Amino acid sequence: MTQTTTTQEVSPVRYDVSLMTAEDFYLFNEGNHYRLYEKMGAHLVESGGTKGTVFSVWAPNARQVAVSGSFNGWNLQTHPLQPRGSSGIWEGFIPGVGKGTLYKFHINSNQDGHETEKADPVALFTEKPPRTASVVWDLDYTWNDAAFLEKRGAANSLHAPMSIYEVHLGSWMRVPEEHNRPLTYREIAPRLADHVNKLGFTHVELLPIMEHPFYGSWGYQTTGYFAPTARYGSPQDFMYFVDYLHQHNIAVILDWVPSHFPSDGHGLAFFDGTHLFEHSDSRQGFHPDWKTMIFNYGRTEVRSFLMSSAMFWL
């Protein structure tokens, strides 16, 4: 898939536009915000007739946070965000930044002057790996599975027969004549639906499709907890996949991995120059077998992040 970048003139950051309310800040810091994907990350908005994108990221130990991307030549200084009180959240509205724009957060930490560039933890879309930038996107889609949902809602799921077909989308079927590439979400939908129905399965369980840098992990080392992997298409392509299976009376189960995450430089590890998402005690924050990081479940904001991710996919 070809990703486009904005050609609009981009203005300086404005701080008068925010998607976060006082209640949002309170719930987030308390550990009870379950819909962060509606407030944080990158969201296309229009304010006073001006179209642009609101950026929001949690980095409580940062001295400065700026957005760099394809819209400003990846400049690390021109578009700084502003901290919102004591919430640890940095936010700003950048006029002219549109759908398809690539971006990252440049974080200058209070911790020993540490500087890093990070992908957006709440991004809805990313570049196709091995590239690691986040992509400004929306979730506009017209669903056609109302009949399936109505039927499912009326059924007694506790007593209904259930037969699950587990599948890794990237290896289930490939195209040998095109360098053995995997099928896209839209290509695999009719093939998988037909195969599953012929075999009599009621459900498909997908190995993790959330974005992940290491293909060999089969998705079990997640970096994008709100983004379907770009390896097979866009978020709308994934929605089409789920929609198609629903229309053919196949329920979809998603594997979700809140247990650990990889230490890749663009990801969650050492996010703002401190152990933010992972536990600071290596006995609790590092998985010796997988060489991955373990979430700090005792941190309220981490709980908000993980619960929001779980709710996002429902």
Segments predicted by a language model, with ranges:
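The feature marks proteins involved in alpha-glucan
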Residues: 1-50, 84-166, 171-180, 184-187
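Short beta-strand elements bearing conserved aromatic residues within extracellular beta-rich modules
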Residues: 65-67, 103
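Substrate-binding/active-site clefts of carbohydrate-active enzymes
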Residues: 150-159, 168-314
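Structural beta-strand segments of beta-rich domains
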Residues: 51-56
